[in-house]
Regions:
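Extracytoplasmic gating/loop element in the C-terminal half of outer-membrane beta-barrel translocons
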Residues: 33-34, 151
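Extracellular/periplasmic, surface-exposed regions of secreted and cell-surface proteins
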Residues: 1-26, 39-244
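Short amphipathic helix-turn modules centered on a small-residue break
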Residues: 28-30
Length: 244
């Protein structure tokens, strides 16, 4: 959308929704001798049913403005924007054994060995960015970029990262002394650039937090096994962006 002469803006929003329900059932099948109906060994010791429910929500929003102006042999292009993306994922698992009937395809049909577990995770990335382009007579080109990112994967004190870049180019093929070569060399450019990028991906979504989980693998207390919590990963609150 063009708001003023040379100035345009856009807003984009996208979402991805995923809901998956998976069921699996194993029935106990008894084999018999055809002539005598004498039971033989069954194909499995018990019947079972399991169910998994997966729900995922991903969203992304982008707000961006562009301004371009040409005066004489000079062209200036400015760009600034903001973006954010976030994702939430939930998973639930449940299973039962010894079904009262093979025709009941629901968890409540199981009478033994109730197992349940679930997990949830989420992440977000917020970014601001800008760019300046300068062009003189389509011969001398300059570009500067800067972006600032905030990632939920890092401790609040270390979530931000600055990533600048700059480049300059000379289209020597546009110079008058290259005029005779334009029939076979119409675009020759020398370019020099320097920049940095950030990498936020680590072995987990929360490397700065020490996570815990329930366990029964501990020494018995009073002759019986006791449930407890244990730390299953080391934390590093100082971990931050990898600069490339």
């Amino acid at each position: 959308m063009e708001i003023l002469k040379g100035f345009t803006a856009k807003i984009q929003y996208a979402t991805r929704l995923k809901d998956v329900l998976r069921k699996q059932q194993s029935n106990k099948i008894q084999h018999y001798i055809p002539d005598t109906d004498t039971p033989l060994a069954s194909s499995s010791t018990t019947s079972s049913i399991s169910q998994r429910d997966i729900s995922e929500r991903y969203q992304n929003i982008l707000v961006q403005g562009d301004y371009e102006r040409t005066f004489g042999k000079h062209t200036v292009h400015l760009l600034a924007g903001f973006s954010q993306e976030w994702n939430e994922n939930q998973t639930m698992n449940a299973s039962r054994q010894d079904l009262v009937s093979d025709d009941l395809h629901v968890l409540n049909a199981g009478t033994e060995k109730f197992d349940n577990d679930g997990m949830g995770e989420e992440w977000a990335l917020r970014s601001g960015f800008g760019r300046i382009n300068y062009n003189f007579d389509d011969r001398y080109l300059f570009e500067a970029n800067l972006r600032y990112d905030l990632s939920s994967r890092f401790h609040p004190d270390h979530r931000g990262g600055y990533f600048p870049s700059v480049s300059a180019a000379w289209r020597i093929s546009e110079e008058t002394f290259m005029r005779r070569t334009r029939s076979w060399l119409d675009n020759l450019k020398f370019r020099l650039s320097y920049g940095t990028l950030g990498n936020q991906y680590t072995s987990s979504l929360y490397p700065y937090m020490a996570t815990i989980e329930p366990t029964t693998s501990i020494m018995p207390i009073g002759g019986s096994i006791t449930s407890a919590m244990r730390q299953n990963s080391a934390s590093n609150r100082y971990i931050t962006w990898e600069t490339i």
